[in-house]
Every structure is written in C-alpha cells, then in structure tokens.
Amino acid sequence: MDRIIAAVVAGVIALAPMAATAQDYGRYSDAAAQTELSRIADVRMAVMVPMRDGVGLATNVYRPKNAPGPLPTVFVRTPYNELANNARTTRTALTWISRGYAFVIQNERGRYFSGGDYQILGYPQTDGYDALTWIAAQPWSNGKVGTLGCSSSAEWQLALAAQNHPAHAAMVPQASGAGIGKVGRFQEQGNWYTGGVPRSLFFVWLYGVDNPLRAQIPVDIDQETRARLVRYNDLDAKKPEVNWPSQIRHLPVDQMLSDLGEPPATFEQLIARTPADPAWRQGGLYHDDMG
C-alpha cells in the first residue's frame, strides 16, 4: 500500500497539465452546462472500448477543442447510469476539460450499454488494465492517466494500482470501503461480510443495482446509432418498491431476493460463499495478496 500511496503523490505532479482559470460549474443550470460543454469540448459518446476477451465497454470521451497537443486523461469507471445526458457527468467533464485534461467515463462490464455480464467492480484486474491501455494508445493521449471516483468507482482503482500499469500516473480513490483480508481473527469481504455476518443493507443496494434482465444492444451497431441510443434511452431497471423493514427479515436469507421475483444473479452467487471462500480473491476486490 505504501507503494500505491507514493505513486499517487508522484503521479499527481507528473499528470498536471497547463494551468487554467477555475470555473464553478455547479452554479450553471443543466442547460447552460450542456451548452458550455458543446462549446469547449469534442464529445464521443458510447465508444465501445474492446477488452481482451472481445467484450466492448461503453465509454464517453470528452476532449478540449483545439488542444495544442496530446493530453493527460482523468478516467472514471462506474456501475451507475452516468453516461446518458447525466448532469453530474457534464459538470465533471467541464471541470477537467477547462483545465486542459481529457475526461473519460466508462460503464463497467454488464452495466447499461456495456457488453458482458455484471460482476461487482467489473473485473478491474483485466478490464481496468485494458481500458488504460486503450486510453494511452489514443492519438490524443500523452500516455498519462489518472483514475478518480468514490465508492465503487474508488474500489476498483486499488486492484488496478497493484498491477503497476505504465500509464497509471495518479489515483484518487474516495471512500473505498471494500477489500478482502484478515482483520484480527476475522475474514473480511468488503461490503458483504463483517466478522462473518452478512451485511443485509448491501442486499438492498444489490436489489436496486443488479439487473440481469437488462436489454443489450447488438454489438455490430454503428457508432452514430449507438450514441443516439445512449442519448435518448434509459436502461435503468424500473423495479417495484419493497417494504425493506419487513423484507430484510425474510428467512431463509438466501431467498430474500428470489421471493421478490428476482431472477438468480449476483446475490445468489455471493450469499452462498463462506467468509473464507477463495472465490472472493478471484474478482475485483483489493486483497492482502495484491501488490
């Protein structure tokens, strides 16, 4: 971990581009922010970035117009619906573009317009690495990528940093609470177990996030059509409201979501694992044996 922290400090210095006058884009209306983004940025929406197994991940790329040369990049990966006309994404892109960075945001595998099947944290040991390789190879990139994000968008950065990708110049993992390892005599599994007891609050989150019945866009669709689909369509699941104070007491626990009509998905995989199951170390969570 000391190596990771040192890389953050050194990378932030190395990544820094030209200075720019700061703007408070939080004061802009949604319409004004979108207008300003159109004025100062070249935008490509839903670019399908290929992973090593051929699966494409939907990615928005924002670059300053008329940039004088290759740019450093700020990169966010997210499981949430932040690519399609998202006001927060627009303001974040403005913040970085106005300072001379490219800004790239990508949906994790199996989320919204990305291909493949969802796994919590989205295969950071392969997908995260491959995404950085793709960014660094673009003609507009100077080969330096800083990763940024909170919660899930922070946790994948730790597993990525342990791989020492040559383009990974800086990282800012905010509120990265999940990891795998031993705390005293207990095995910890990120958000799932604490001292061997499953965290029922995480079940509620998973019900809202996991969507195994999501629509998938044909992989051979052209880029322009895919971008229009992202702009004008919403793949968020519209699930029924649940009385969680009652449902959280459901027994047996492993049928808590199937009792709501949910098809088998991530919950059923994780609830079947014991705290010491070696499968915890095969996913994207940072663990004791990394780096």
PLM regions and their residue ranges:
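Bacterial N-terminal signal peptides
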Residues: 7-16
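Boundary at the C-terminal end of the N-terminal hydrophobic targeting segment
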Residues: 19-22
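N-terminal cap/lid segment of alpha/beta-hydrolase-fold proteins
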Residues: 28-69
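Cap/lid segment of the alpha/beta-hydrolase catalytic domain
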Residues: 64-136, 186
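Accessory cap/linker subdomain of secreted extracellular hydrolases
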Residues: 90, 98, 162-164, 170-290
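Alpha/beta-hydrolase fold nucleophile elbow
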Residues: 139-151
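Catalytic nucleophile serine of serine hydrolases
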Residues: 151-152, 175
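Short glycine-enriched nucleophile-adjacent loop
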Residues: 154-165
